[in-house]
Amino acid sequence: MSNMPNIKIGVVAVSRDCFPESLSVNRRKALIDAYKAKYGEEHIYECPVCIVESEIHMVQALEDVKAAGCDALVVYLGNFGPEIAETLLAKHFDGPKMFIAAAEESGDSLMDGRGDAYCGMLNASYNLKLRNVKAYIPEYPIGTAEECADMIHEFEPIARAIVALNSLKIISFGPRPLNFLACNAPIKQLYNLGVEIEENSELDLFEAFNKHE
């Protein structure tokens, strides 16, 4: 028996309107191809909506990943990225999220192929903090398609742990009776993790035992 959640990660590309949208879209496709080639397609979903400085696009992407059954979210900056829409997406997505960004492929296409996603990543992290949105950002979040695919794979166990904890309920037995939280053991950090806890006394256990006879 396995009690670990099966994670599906939705990848949403974002683009600033002063950069070609196609740059983010093509980089997203390359990222998804790199991931599937190395890790398979069971845990990944490519959102077809590219957010281009639009809250309408943000809502469309949010509804799409929800409809696809995604448990976790990757916001992928194919270029500088729209700070408002991309962080609003993270705010409204109810689940673990990660931000990563595309490195420049080469110095030969800096007219149409330059994305400045490194700078966009700095601004995105600052805006996440302003909104008090918790998101996972790798130690070095900028990479090629293959490197970003590895980052997503490394994010999977993190996302799985968060989803599992948010669905966890601990039923414990100790000296305190049921529903006396004021005199319960320190449980705030469990609540902060999204864990629910129910503590029962020995008398509660005895009563439950007798009811099952």
Residue ranges and their predicted role:
Residues 1-162, 167-171, 176-213:
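Metallocofactor- and cofactor-centric catalytic cores in central/energy metabolism, strongly enriched
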